From Swiss-Prot:
It comes from the Bacteria. It catalyses: alpha-D-glucosamine 6-phosphate + H2O = beta-D-fructose 6-phosphate + NH4(+). The lineage of its organism: Bacteria, Bacillati, Bacillota, Bacilli, Bacillales. The active site is at D67, N136, H138, E143. GO terms for cellular component: cytoplasm. It holds the Pfam family Glucosamine_iso. Its EC number is 3.5.99.6. It comes from Oceanobacillus iheyensis (strain DSM 14371 / CIP 107618 / JCM 11309 / KCTC 3954 / HTE831). One of its GO terms (biological process) is glucosamine catabolic process. This is Glucosamine-6-phosphate deaminase. Pathway: Amino-sugar metabolism; N-acetylneuraminate degradation; D-fructose 6-phosphate from N-acetylneuraminate: step 5/5.
Amino acid sequence: MKIIQTENYQSMSKLASQHVINTIKQLNKPVLGLATGSTPEGLYQHLIKAYRMHQISFANVSTFNLDEYVGLHKEDKNSYHYYMQKFLFNHVDIPYKNIHLPNGIAKDLSVECTSYEDRIQQAGGIHIQVLGIGRNGHIGFNEPGTSFESQTHVVDLDESTRNANARFFDSIDEVPNQAITMGIQSIMRAKEILLLVSGSEKAEALEKLVNGNVSEEFPASILQTHQNVKIIADKAALQDISYHHFSETM
């Protein structure tokens, strides 16, 4: 596990984008695992900028998102389909057929979960998975207590997670109670994991990830066992972690 400290959110986002850009350039058919929320927005802005400057193309890129709310149509402004179009896909040359997100309005959610796993495997697996971390240690929508053996599944959202996401909705009552999420085993199959952490409000969770015990009660702790994890975090998020943990390079 490498930890790279940056000065602030902006430098975290830029460094993350440089790493993703290098990955895209190195591979013939790169497969990216993508996340939503406020943390990766800066990363996506830098990727769009690189595309507009003709530094990269997404023509051969395939993407798989971590999760989607159950019950929200892809055109709903709070769906993750909508988020990804708004913050990345509408601004680059990625073919529509290469974009994959769970279908939160599928008639049979169990079949959708199995199908999503199959699509990831058919694409050859994920080369680099972008992650954030929740204050309770969730990754994707895998809440505390989720089995480390879990694959893509439907999850009941923890109240703390719904409260954290309420800022994106008109009220807490509009936040869905369920989501489809890649499971922890699904995430761990990625060849590389890129965890982005920013802000003092994530410091306690990040310290627990780095120094705590591996436990299903803190899902992100499983990342300690992955062979290729890079954490890019700003100073505020790293305030509880001693400097000797840090790496100078990617």
